[in-house]
């Protein structure tokens, strides 16, 4: 299955490259170009954190890791609080007692829970206001509720036995519950905490990038035990190469599925933007958040729920996984697709009919 996925990505790269050669006639060439254009922003956001990964894991090793071991848990799970491409994988790998649990935490947990905490929630809080934000937070509650189920599926597919998988996933379920309670009853305070955490990671990334550049250029170690910046850039480059194929392939998939999804949206009484955003979100969450002002309340809730697991599956997260742990490609995509669809279906079932087709922003 992994081979079939990689072949599909390679075909996407061929289609994008050929279209670029003939003048972007089918609009796939621009998606091909976008893969490389994203290298700069990707490097700026993650290379510095990757350089600092040994220090982050060392800090966790001397603080929380002993408690985790005393509870019978693998310290690798601590890395899952960071996004997969913001040090989550490297931290989990360095802390892991069991390599399989390290991959589970660093790929599956970090690509879902970690991405939600460090990126989706702070970004959404900054972009959305009023009823738009209300639909977004409602969807996050649903998505966080289904997250442990999706992780159990992905962990089982990756080869982890059921009992160890349940034990290691329990802290994730409890943390998801705490996030749900925080967003439900202390939304403003929770958002401030998430935003501060995301800002801290941005600061650390810039510091790590600066120190890594100085060490590479001048041979001066401003920060001891820093991972070489060229290793971080190798990971970033791998993501960019994969996106040369994944972005055109995702565009083809979007075109194939757009009409069936539009018909489904009409049956559910939802706006076109609400259904179209699901396919966009499988590539990147940022444009989905921008589109939420065009959605009805049901669409906002559904897309936010979908994003907890499914965000960026066919772009940065797939590229990172192919570079770091290619054997986890199938578990990653199954976790993201199953979790996203399950959350989206629940969001539709749990929202009222009057929320469909009603433009949330008009009351903002």
Region annotations inferred by a language model:
Residues 55-74:
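Interfacial/capping segments of alpha-helical transmembrane domains
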Residues 23-28, 60, 253-260:
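Juxtamembrane/interfacial segments flanking transmembrane helices
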Residues 71-146, 271-325:
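Alpha-helical membrane segments and immediately flanking helix-loop junctions
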Residues 1-48, 104-113, 118-245, 326-364:
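Signature of multi-pass transmembrane helix bundles
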Residues 30-38, 65-69, 231, 259-270:
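Short amphipathic alpha-helical coupling elements at transmembrane boundaries
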Residues 56-60, 215, 313-327, 333, ...:
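Juxtamembrane "helix exit" motif at the C-terminal ends of alpha-helical transmembrane segments
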Residues 221-273, 280:
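Long, well-ordered mid-to-C-terminal structural blocks that present hydrophobic/aromatic surfaces
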């Amino acid at each position: 299955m992994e081979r079939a996925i990689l072949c599909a990505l390679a075909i996407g790269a061929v289609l994008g490259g050929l279209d670029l050669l003939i003048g972007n006639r089918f609009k796939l060439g621009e998606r091909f170009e976008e893969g490389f254009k994203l290298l700069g922003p990707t490097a700026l956001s993650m290379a510095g954190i990757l350089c600092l990964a040994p220090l982050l894991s060392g800090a966790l090793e001397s603080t929380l890791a002993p408690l985790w071991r005393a509870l019978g848990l693998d310290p690798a799970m601590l890395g899952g609080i960071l996004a997969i491409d913001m040090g989550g994988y490297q931290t989990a790998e360095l802390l892991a007692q069991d390599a399989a649990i390290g991959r589970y935490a660093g790929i599956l947990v970090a690509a879902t829970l970690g991405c939600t905490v460090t990126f989706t929630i702070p970004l959404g809080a900054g972009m959305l206001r009023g009823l738009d934000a209300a639909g977004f937070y409602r969807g996050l509650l649903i998505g966080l509720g289904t997250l442990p189920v999706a992780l159990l599926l992905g962990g089982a597919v990756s080869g982890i036995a059921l009992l160890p998988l349940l034990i290691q996933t329990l802290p994730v379920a409890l943390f998801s519950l705490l996030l749900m309670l925080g967003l439900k009853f202390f939304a403003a305070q929770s958002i401030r905490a998430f935003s501060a955490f995301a800002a801290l990671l941005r600061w650390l990334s810039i510091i790590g990038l600066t120190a890594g550049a100085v060490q590479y250029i001048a041979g001066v170690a401003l920060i001891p035990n820093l991972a070489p910046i060229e290793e971080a850039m190798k990971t970033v480059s791998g993501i960019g190469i994969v996106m040369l194929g994944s972005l055109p392939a995702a565009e083809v998939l979007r075109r194939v599925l757009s009409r069936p999804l539009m018909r489904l949206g009409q049956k559910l009484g939802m706006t076109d933007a609400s259904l179209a955003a699901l396919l966009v979100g499988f590539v990147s969450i940022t444009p989905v958040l921008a589109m939420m002002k065009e959605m009805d309340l049901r669409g906002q809730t559904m897309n936010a729920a979908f994003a907890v697991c499914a965000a960026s599956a066919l772009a940065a997260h797939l590229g990172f996984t192919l570079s770091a742990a290619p054997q986890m490609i199938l578990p990653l995509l199954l976790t993201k697709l199953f979790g996203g669809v399950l959350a989206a279906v629940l969001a539709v079932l749990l929202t009222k009919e009057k929320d469909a087709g009603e433009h949330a922003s008009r009351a903002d």
